[in-house]
Protein backbone atom coordinates (compact mmCIF):
# COMPACT_ATOMS: atom_id res chain seq x y z
CA UNK A 1 0.00 0.00 0.00
CA UNK A 2 1.32 3.39 -1.02
CA UNK A 3 1.67 6.50 1.17
CA UNK A 4 0.70 9.58 -0.88
CA UNK A 5 -0.01 13.30 -0.58
CA UNK A 6 -3.55 14.61 -0.99
CA UNK A 7 -2.56 16.52 -4.12
CA UNK A 8 -1.73 13.18 -5.80
CA UNK A 9 -5.16 11.66 -5.11
CA UNK A 10 -6.18 12.01 -8.78
CA UNK A 11 -3.52 9.46 -9.70
CA UNK A 12 -4.88 6.85 -7.28
CA UNK A 13 -8.65 6.70 -7.88
CA UNK A 14 -10.13 3.40 -6.61
CA UNK A 15 -6.80 2.54 -4.96
CA UNK A 16 -6.19 1.95 -1.27
CA UNK A 17 -3.67 4.47 0.10
CA UNK A 18 -2.29 5.90 3.33
CA UNK A 19 -2.02 9.66 3.97
CA UNK A 20 -0.60 11.71 6.85
CA UNK A 21 -3.07 14.52 7.61
CA UNK A 22 -4.42 17.02 10.12
CA UNK A 23 -8.12 17.32 10.93
CA UNK A 24 -9.45 20.81 10.17
CA UNK A 25 -13.14 20.21 10.90
CA UNK A 26 -15.72 17.44 11.13
CA UNK A 27 -19.42 16.69 11.16
CA UNK A 28 -21.28 13.45 11.63
CA UNK A 29 -24.68 11.82 11.57
CA UNK A 30 -25.61 8.57 13.18
CA UNK A 31 -24.07 6.43 10.48
CA UNK A 32 -21.50 8.61 8.65
CA UNK A 33 -18.68 10.90 9.80
CA UNK A 34 -17.23 13.54 7.46
CA UNK A 35 -13.68 14.62 8.23
CA UNK A 36 -12.14 17.70 6.60
CA UNK A 37 -8.47 16.87 6.14
CA UNK A 38 -5.31 18.67 5.04
CA UNK A 39 -1.68 17.68 4.59
CA UNK A 40 -0.03 20.88 3.32
CA UNK A 41 -0.51 19.97 -0.34
CA UNK A 42 -4.33 20.27 -0.51
CA UNK A 43 -7.58 19.86 1.40
CA UNK A 44 -10.15 17.12 0.93
CA UNK A 45 -12.85 15.16 2.70
CA UNK A 46 -12.58 11.82 4.44
CA UNK A 47 -15.76 9.76 4.77
CA UNK A 48 -16.15 7.18 7.53
CA UNK A 49 -19.16 4.85 7.17
CA UNK A 50 -20.19 3.16 10.42
CA UNK A 51 -21.10 -0.19 8.88
CA UNK A 52 -17.82 -0.36 6.90
CA UNK A 53 -15.32 0.11 9.75
CA UNK A 54 -14.69 -1.20 13.24
CA UNK A 55 -16.55 0.27 16.20
CA UNK A 56 -13.27 1.72 17.49
CA UNK A 57 -12.53 3.48 14.19
CA UNK A 58 -16.00 5.03 13.94
CA UNK A 59 -15.89 6.16 17.56
CA UNK A 60 -12.49 7.75 16.95
CA UNK A 61 -13.81 9.53 13.85
CA UNK A 62 -16.58 11.11 15.94
CA UNK A 63 -14.33 12.03 18.87
CA UNK A 64 -11.12 13.22 17.21
CA UNK A 65 -10.42 16.91 17.81
CA UNK A 66 -9.53 19.77 15.48
CA UNK A 67 -5.87 19.82 14.32
CA UNK A 68 -5.13 16.32 15.62
CA UNK A 69 -2.56 14.72 13.32
CA UNK A 70 -3.50 11.36 11.84
CA UNK A 71 -2.65 8.63 9.43
CA UNK A 72 -5.76 7.67 7.47
CA UNK A 73 -5.99 4.59 5.28
CA UNK A 74 -8.70 4.12 2.69
CA UNK A 75 -9.80 4.19 -0.94
CA UNK A 76 -9.71 7.32 -3.13
CA UNK A 77 -12.92 8.24 -5.00
CA UNK A 78 -13.89 11.10 -7.27
CA UNK A 79 -15.99 13.84 -5.62
CA UNK A 80 -17.31 16.22 -8.25
CA UNK A 81 -19.12 18.34 -5.66
CA UNK A 82 -15.89 19.68 -4.16
CA UNK A 83 -13.34 22.17 -5.52
CA UNK A 84 -10.66 19.53 -5.15
CA UNK A 85 -12.59 16.78 -6.91
CA UNK A 86 -11.61 13.76 -4.79
CA UNK A 87 -12.25 12.25 -1.36
CA UNK A 88 -11.10 9.25 0.65
CA UNK A 89 -13.37 6.55 2.06
CA UNK A 90 -11.56 5.87 5.31
CA UNK A 91 -11.07 2.35 6.62
CA UNK A 92 -8.51 2.95 9.38
CA UNK A 93 -7.43 5.92 11.52
CA UNK A 94 -4.22 6.20 13.54
CA UNK A 95 -3.67 9.17 15.86
CA UNK A 96 -0.16 10.63 15.58
CA UNK A 97 -0.39 13.78 17.72
CA UNK A 98 -3.21 14.95 19.99
CA UNK A 99 -4.65 18.46 19.78
CA UNK A 100 -6.62 19.73 22.75
CA UNK A 101 -8.51 23.04 22.84
CA UNK A 102 -7.13 24.37 19.55
CA UNK A 103 -7.54 28.16 19.87
CA UNK A 104 -8.70 28.93 16.32
CA UNK A 105 -12.12 27.31 16.22
CA UNK A 106 -14.29 27.28 13.06
CA UNK A 107 -16.17 30.40 14.28
CA UNK A 108 -15.25 33.96 13.22
CA UNK A 109 -12.25 35.62 14.91
CA UNK A 110 -10.98 39.21 14.90
CA UNK A 111 -7.86 40.34 13.05
CA UNK A 112 -5.78 40.94 16.19
CA UNK A 113 -6.60 37.47 17.51
CA UNK A 114 -5.63 35.86 14.21
CA UNK A 115 -2.41 37.88 14.02
CA UNK A 116 -1.53 36.85 17.61
CA UNK A 117 -2.01 33.25 16.49
CA UNK A 118 -0.45 33.67 13.06
CA UNK A 119 1.71 30.57 13.60
CA UNK A 120 -1.53 28.56 13.70
CA UNK A 121 -3.62 30.68 11.33
CA UNK A 122 -1.20 29.72 8.55
CA UNK A 123 -2.92 26.31 8.65
CA UNK A 124 -6.22 27.78 7.42
CA UNK A 125 -7.53 27.07 3.94
CA UNK A 126 -7.36 30.72 2.91
CA UNK A 127 -3.75 31.10 4.03
CA UNK A 128 -2.87 27.84 2.31
CA UNK A 129 -4.23 29.24 -0.97
CA UNK A 130 -2.39 32.57 -0.63
CA UNK A 131 0.94 30.92 0.21
CA UNK A 132 0.57 28.49 -2.69
CA UNK A 133 0.15 31.45 -5.04
CA UNK A 134 3.04 33.32 -3.41
CA UNK A 135 5.23 30.26 -3.89
CA UNK A 136 4.22 29.97 -7.55
CA UNK A 137 5.09 33.63 -8.12
CA UNK A 138 8.54 33.09 -6.60
CA UNK A 139 9.08 30.01 -8.76
CA UNK A 140 7.93 31.89 -11.87
CA UNK A 141 10.24 34.81 -11.01
CA UNK A 142 13.32 32.61 -11.10
CA UNK A 143 12.09 30.91 -14.26
CA UNK A 144 11.41 34.20 -16.05
CA UNK A 145 14.75 35.83 -15.27
CA UNK A 146 16.72 32.66 -15.96
CA UNK A 147 15.05 32.41 -19.37
CA UNK A 148 15.89 36.07 -20.01
CA UNK A 149 19.60 35.50 -19.35
CA UNK A 150 19.82 37.14 -15.90
CA UNK A 151 21.94 35.82 -13.06
CA UNK A 152 20.96 36.16 -9.41
CA UNK A 153 23.28 38.47 -7.49
CA UNK A 154 22.70 38.53 -3.75
CA UNK A 155 22.83 42.02 -2.24
CA UNK A 156 23.87 42.52 1.41
CA UNK A 157 21.27 43.07 4.13
CA UNK A 158 23.65 45.20 6.23
CA UNK A 159 24.77 48.31 4.41
CA UNK A 160 26.47 51.63 5.03
CA UNK A 161 25.00 53.22 1.88
CA UNK A 162 21.34 54.13 1.58
CA UNK A 163 19.78 54.32 -1.91
CA UNK A 164 17.02 56.72 -0.86
CA UNK A 165 18.25 58.49 2.27
CA UNK A 166 18.36 57.27 5.86
CA UNK A 167 15.10 58.60 7.32
CA UNK A 168 13.24 55.33 6.72
CA UNK A 169 16.10 52.97 7.58
CA UNK A 170 16.60 50.79 10.62
CA UNK A 171 19.87 51.83 12.24
CA UNK A 172 22.26 49.46 13.93
CA UNK A 173 25.89 49.49 15.04
CA UNK A 174 28.46 47.70 12.91
CA UNK A 175 31.29 47.42 15.43
CA UNK A 176 32.67 50.99 15.44
CA UNK A 177 30.47 52.56 12.75
CA UNK A 178 26.86 53.04 11.70
CA UNK A 179 25.06 50.52 9.53
CA UNK A 180 21.51 50.05 8.30
CA UNK A 181 19.19 47.23 7.37
CA UNK A 182 18.82 47.35 3.61
CA UNK A 183 15.81 49.08 2.10
CA UNK A 184 16.91 48.07 -1.39
CA UNK A 185 19.63 46.05 -3.09
CA UNK A 186 19.57 48.33 -6.13
CA UNK A 187 22.95 50.03 -5.78
CA UNK A 188 24.67 46.68 -5.47
CA UNK A 189 22.70 45.28 -8.39
CA UNK A 190 23.99 48.18 -10.50
CA UNK A 191 27.52 47.04 -9.68
CA UNK A 192 26.48 43.54 -10.71
CA UNK A 193 25.05 44.78 -14.01
CA UNK A 194 28.40 46.38 -14.86
CA UNK A 195 30.04 43.00 -14.25
CA UNK A 196 27.52 40.52 -15.67
CA UNK A 197 25.15 42.49 -17.90
CA UNK A 198 21.76 41.44 -16.49
CA UNK A 199 21.29 40.61 -12.82
CA UNK A 200 18.51 40.42 -10.26
CA UNK A 201 18.21 40.11 -6.51
CA UNK A 202 15.41 38.63 -4.46
CA UNK A 203 15.47 39.19 -0.75
CA UNK A 204 14.04 40.95 2.30
CA UNK A 205 14.04 44.72 2.62
CA UNK A 206 13.20 46.93 5.58
CA UNK A 207 11.44 50.30 5.75
CA UNK A 208 11.03 52.12 9.05
CA UNK A 209 7.85 53.81 7.82
CA UNK A 210 5.32 54.63 10.51
CA UNK A 211 2.48 53.67 8.21
CA UNK A 212 -0.65 51.68 9.02
CA UNK A 213 -2.11 51.44 5.53
CA UNK A 214 -3.24 48.18 3.97
CA UNK A 215 -0.40 48.50 1.43
CA UNK A 216 2.60 48.78 3.76
CA UNK A 217 4.81 46.30 5.58
CA UNK A 218 7.91 47.04 7.65
CA UNK A 219 9.68 43.96 6.26
CA UNK A 220 8.91 42.73 2.76
CA UNK A 221 10.52 40.96 -0.18
CA UNK A 222 11.72 42.67 -3.35
CA UNK A 223 12.67 41.48 -6.81
CA UNK A 224 15.21 43.97 -8.19
CA UNK A 225 16.62 43.50 -11.71
CA UNK A 226 19.29 45.74 -13.24
CA UNK A 227 20.23 45.71 -16.93
CA UNK A 228 23.34 47.16 -18.61
CA UNK A 229 23.15 48.70 -22.09
CA UNK A 230 19.43 49.23 -21.63
CA UNK A 231 17.28 52.35 -21.83
CA UNK A 232 13.99 52.91 -20.03
CA UNK A 233 11.61 51.78 -22.80
CA UNK A 234 13.37 48.42 -23.06
CA UNK A 235 13.12 48.09 -19.28
CA UNK A 236 9.37 48.80 -19.40
CA UNK A 237 8.96 45.97 -21.90
CA UNK A 238 10.72 43.56 -19.54
CA UNK A 239 8.61 44.78 -16.62
CA UNK A 240 5.28 44.21 -18.35
CA UNK A 241 6.34 40.83 -19.71
CA UNK A 242 7.46 39.81 -16.23
CA UNK A 243 4.19 40.82 -14.57
CA UNK A 244 2.13 39.15 -17.30
CA UNK A 245 4.29 36.03 -16.84
CA UNK A 246 3.55 36.00 -13.11
CA UNK A 247 -0.19 36.28 -13.70
CA UNK A 248 -0.20 33.60 -16.40
CA UNK A 249 1.85 31.23 -14.24
CA UNK A 250 -0.68 31.59 -11.42
CA UNK A 251 -3.55 30.99 -13.86
CA UNK A 252 -1.81 27.91 -15.25
CA UNK A 253 -0.63 26.35 -11.99
CA UNK A 254 -2.88 27.61 -9.17
CA UNK A 255 -6.44 26.92 -10.28
CA UNK A 256 -7.27 25.17 -7.00
CA UNK A 257 -5.94 28.00 -4.75
CA UNK A 258 -7.71 30.57 -6.94
CA UNK A 259 -10.98 28.64 -6.52
CA UNK A 260 -10.52 28.58 -2.75
CA UNK A 261 -10.10 32.38 -2.76
CA UNK A 262 -12.96 32.94 -5.21
CA UNK A 263 -10.67 35.00 -7.45
CA UNK A 264 -12.17 36.05 -10.79
CA UNK A 265 -9.85 34.44 -13.32
CA UNK A 266 -11.40 36.33 -16.24
CA UNK A 267 -10.16 39.55 -14.66
CA UNK A 268 -6.69 38.06 -14.21
CA UNK A 269 -6.60 36.96 -17.85
CA UNK A 270 -7.01 40.60 -18.87
CA UNK A 271 -3.76 41.40 -17.08
CA UNK A 272 -1.82 39.07 -19.40
CA UNK A 273 -2.70 41.19 -22.45
CA UNK A 274 0.23 43.36 -23.53
CA UNK A 275 1.31 46.07 -23.88
CA UNK A 276 0.20 47.91 -20.76
CA UNK A 277 -0.82 51.56 -21.21
CA UNK A 278 1.81 54.26 -20.74
CA UNK A 279 1.06 57.82 -19.67
CA UNK A 280 3.28 60.62 -18.44
CA UNK A 281 3.04 62.13 -14.98
CA UNK A 282 1.79 65.30 -16.70
CA UNK A 283 -1.01 63.35 -18.38
CA UNK A 284 -1.85 61.64 -15.10
CA UNK A 285 -2.24 65.00 -13.38
CA UNK A 286 -4.50 66.14 -16.21
CA UNK A 287 -6.65 63.00 -15.95
CA UNK A 288 -7.05 63.46 -12.20
CA UNK A 289 -7.95 67.13 -12.54
CA UNK A 290 -10.46 66.46 -15.32
CA UNK A 291 -12.18 63.76 -13.26
CA UNK A 292 -13.46 66.35 -10.79
CA UNK A 293 -12.67 63.96 -7.93
CA UNK A 294 -9.30 65.42 -6.97
CA UNK A 295 -9.67 69.20 -6.65
CA UNK A 296 -6.50 69.56 -4.59
CA UNK A 297 -4.14 67.59 -6.82
CA UNK A 298 -1.34 69.65 -8.30
CA UNK A 299 1.83 69.14 -10.29
CA UNK A 300 4.90 68.31 -8.22
CA UNK A 301 3.26 66.07 -5.63
CA UNK A 302 3.45 62.30 -5.40
CA UNK A 303 0.25 60.31 -5.79
CA UNK A 304 -1.54 58.79 -2.85
CA UNK A 305 -3.67 55.67 -2.79
CA UNK A 306 -6.88 57.31 -4.13
CA UNK A 307 -5.05 58.87 -7.09
CA UNK A 308 -3.24 55.62 -7.96
CA UNK A 309 -6.51 53.69 -7.73
CA UNK A 310 -8.29 56.09 -10.06
CA UNK A 311 -5.53 56.03 -12.66
CA UNK A 312 -5.28 52.23 -12.78
CA UNK A 313 -9.07 51.79 -12.87
CA UNK A 314 -9.26 54.27 -15.74
CA UNK A 315 -7.38 51.75 -17.88
CA UNK A 316 -8.72 48.54 -16.22
CA UNK A 317 -5.26 46.99 -16.33
CA UNK A 318 -1.77 47.82 -15.06
CA UNK A 319 -0.56 51.20 -16.28
CA UNK A 320 2.87 52.86 -16.37
CA UNK A 321 3.04 56.45 -15.13
CA UNK A 322 6.29 57.89 -16.48
CA UNK A 323 8.63 60.82 -15.86
CA UNK A 324 7.80 62.03 -12.36
CA UNK A 325 9.08 65.33 -10.96
CA UNK A 326 12.74 65.17 -10.04
CA UNK A 327 12.09 66.66 -6.60
CA UNK A 328 10.05 63.67 -5.39
CA UNK A 329 12.30 60.89 -6.68
CA UNK A 330 15.64 59.44 -5.44
CA UNK A 331 19.03 60.85 -6.41
CA UNK A 332 20.13 58.06 -8.76
CA UNK A 333 17.55 58.58 -11.51
CA UNK A 334 18.63 59.91 -14.90
CA UNK A 335 17.46 63.45 -15.71
CA UNK A 336 15.17 63.89 -18.69
CA UNK A 337 17.12 65.04 -21.78
CA UNK A 338 14.79 67.96 -22.57
CA UNK A 339 13.38 68.90 -19.15
CA UNK A 340 15.20 69.78 -15.95
CA UNK A 341 12.18 69.20 -13.74
CA UNK A 342 11.52 65.49 -14.40
CA UNK A 343 13.50 62.24 -14.41
CA UNK A 344 13.33 59.15 -16.62
CA UNK A 345 11.34 56.82 -14.41
CA UNK A 346 8.06 54.94 -14.24
CA UNK A 347 5.77 53.39 -11.65
CA UNK A 348 3.50 50.50 -12.57
CA UNK A 349 0.09 50.90 -10.94
CA UNK A 350 -2.08 47.81 -10.51
CA UNK A 351 -5.87 48.03 -10.91
CA UNK A 352 -8.57 47.06 -8.38
CA UNK A 353 -7.19 49.50 -5.82
CA UNK A 354 -3.73 48.01 -5.30
CA UNK A 355 -1.62 50.91 -6.56
CA UNK A 356 2.12 50.85 -7.19
CA UNK A 357 3.65 47.39 -7.54
CA UNK A 358 6.79 48.39 -9.49
CA UNK A 359 9.06 51.41 -9.35
CA UNK A 360 11.87 51.76 -11.87
CA UNK A 361 14.05 54.16 -13.78
CA UNK A 362 16.95 54.65 -16.09
CA UNK A 363 19.96 55.33 -13.88
CA UNK A 364 22.07 58.47 -13.99
CA UNK A 365 25.49 57.90 -15.61
CA UNK A 366 27.29 61.23 -15.10
CA UNK A 367 29.44 60.99 -11.93
CA UNK A 368 29.47 64.78 -11.39
CA UNK A 369 25.69 64.98 -11.63
CA UNK A 370 25.32 62.03 -9.25
CA UNK A 371 27.69 63.56 -6.73
CA UNK A 372 25.65 66.78 -6.77
CA UNK A 373 22.44 64.82 -6.19
CA UNK A 374 23.97 62.83 -3.33
CA UNK A 375 24.94 66.08 -1.60
CA UNK A 376 21.49 67.60 -2.23
CA UNK A 377 19.93 64.51 -0.63
CA UNK A 378 21.93 65.22 2.53
CA UNK A 379 24.07 62.10 2.17
CA UNK A 380 27.81 61.71 2.69
CA UNK A 381 29.65 61.37 -0.63
CA UNK A 382 32.32 59.24 1.06
CA UNK A 383 29.75 56.49 1.61
CA UNK A 384 29.04 56.43 -2.13
CA UNK A 385 32.53 56.56 -3.63
CA UNK A 386 32.21 52.91 -4.64
CA UNK A 387 28.90 53.70 -6.36
CA UNK A 388 30.44 56.65 -8.21
CA UNK A 389 33.24 54.34 -9.37
CA UNK A 390 30.65 52.51 -11.47
CA UNK A 391 30.37 55.72 -13.55
CA UNK A 392 34.10 56.41 -13.64
CA UNK A 393 35.14 53.10 -15.13
CA UNK A 394 33.25 52.22 -18.28
CA UNK A 395 29.77 53.50 -17.51
CA UNK A 396 26.95 52.52 -19.87
CA UNK A 397 23.23 53.30 -20.16
CA UNK A 398 21.47 51.06 -17.66
CA UNK A 399 18.03 50.67 -16.15
CA UNK A 400 16.37 48.74 -13.37
CA UNK A 401 13.26 48.32 -11.30
CA UNK A 402 11.91 46.81 -8.12
CA UNK A 403 8.74 44.78 -7.63
CA UNK A 404 7.36 44.36 -4.12
CA UNK A 405 6.40 40.70 -3.89
CA UNK A 406 3.74 41.11 -1.21
CA UNK A 407 1.95 43.91 -3.06
CA UNK A 408 1.91 41.77 -6.20
CA UNK A 409 0.65 38.74 -4.24
CA UNK A 410 -2.09 40.84 -2.63
CA UNK A 411 -3.18 42.09 -6.06
CA UNK A 412 -3.16 38.71 -7.82
CA UNK A 413 -4.96 36.96 -4.96
CA UNK A 414 -7.48 39.79 -4.59
CA UNK A 415 -6.87 40.15 -0.86
CA UNK A 416 -7.77 43.34 1.00
CA UNK A 417 -4.65 43.71 3.16
CA UNK A 418 -0.96 43.12 2.48
CA UNK A 419 -0.51 41.37 5.85
CA UNK A 420 -2.13 38.27 4.31
CA UNK A 421 0.58 38.03 1.63
CA UNK A 422 3.54 37.15 3.87
CA UNK A 423 3.81 34.30 6.39
CA UNK A 424 4.73 36.43 9.42
CA UNK A 425 3.92 40.11 8.77
CA UNK A 426 5.94 42.84 10.41
CA UNK A 427 3.69 45.85 10.94
CA UNK A 428 4.05 49.12 12.81
CA UNK A 429 2.54 47.63 15.97
CA UNK A 430 3.42 43.98 15.45
CA UNK A 431 6.62 41.94 15.68
CA UNK A 432 5.06 38.82 17.31
CA UNK A 433 5.05 35.95 16.55
UniProtKB/Swiss-Prot annotation:
Any Pfam family hit: tRNA-synt_2
Q: Provide the GO MF annotations for this entry.
A: asparagine-tRNA ligase activity; ATP binding; catalytic activity, acting on a protein; nucleic acid binding; transferase activity
A cellular-component GO term for this protein: cytoplasm
Name the species this protein comes from. Answer: Ligilactobacillus salivarius (strain UCC118)
Q: Which SUPFAM superfamilies match?
A: Class II aaRS and biotin synthetases, Nucleic acid-binding proteins
* Classification via InterPro entries: Aa-tRNA-synt_II, aa-tRNA-synth_II, aa-tRNA-synth_II/BPL/LPL, Asn-tRNA-ligase, Asp/Asn-tRNA-synth_IIb, NA-bd_OB-fold, NA-bd_OB_tRNA
Presence of the UniProt keyword Aminoacyl-tRNA synthetase in the record: yes
Q: How does it assemble?
A: Homodimer.
- Any one of the GO BP annotations: asparaginyl-tRNA aminoacylation
Leading EC class: ligase
Give the organism's phylogenetic lineage.
Answer: Bacteria, Bacillati, Bacillota, Bacilli, Lactobacillales
| Alphabetically ordered keywords of this record | Aminoacyl-tRNA synthetase, ATP-binding, Cytoplasm, Ligase, Nucleotide-binding, Protein biosynthesis
Q: List the gene name.
A: asnS
- The organism's place on the tree of life at top rank: Bacteria
Under the heading HAMAP family, the entry gives: Asn_tRNA_synth
| Family of the protein in this entry | Belongs to the class-II aminoacyl-tRNA synthetase family.
Compartments where found: Cytoplasm
Catalytic reactions of this protein = tRNA(Asn) + L-asparagine + ATP = L-asparaginyl-tRNA(Asn) + AMP + diphosphate + H(+)
Q: What is this protein called?
A: Asparagine--tRNA ligase
Q: What is its EC number?
A: 6.1.1.22
Amino acid sequence: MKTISIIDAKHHVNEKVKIGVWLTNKRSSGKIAFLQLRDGSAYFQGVVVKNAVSEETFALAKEVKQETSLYVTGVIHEDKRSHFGYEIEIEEIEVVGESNEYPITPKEHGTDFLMDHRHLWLRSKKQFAIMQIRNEMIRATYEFFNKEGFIKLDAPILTGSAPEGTTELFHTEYFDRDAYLSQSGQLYEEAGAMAYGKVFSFGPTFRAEKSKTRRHLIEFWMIEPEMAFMHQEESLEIQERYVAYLVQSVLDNCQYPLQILGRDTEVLKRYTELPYPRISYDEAIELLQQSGKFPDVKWGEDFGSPEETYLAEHFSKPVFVMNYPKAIKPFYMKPHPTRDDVVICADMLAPEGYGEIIGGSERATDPKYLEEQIIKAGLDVKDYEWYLDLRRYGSVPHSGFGLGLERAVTWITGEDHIREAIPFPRLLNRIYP
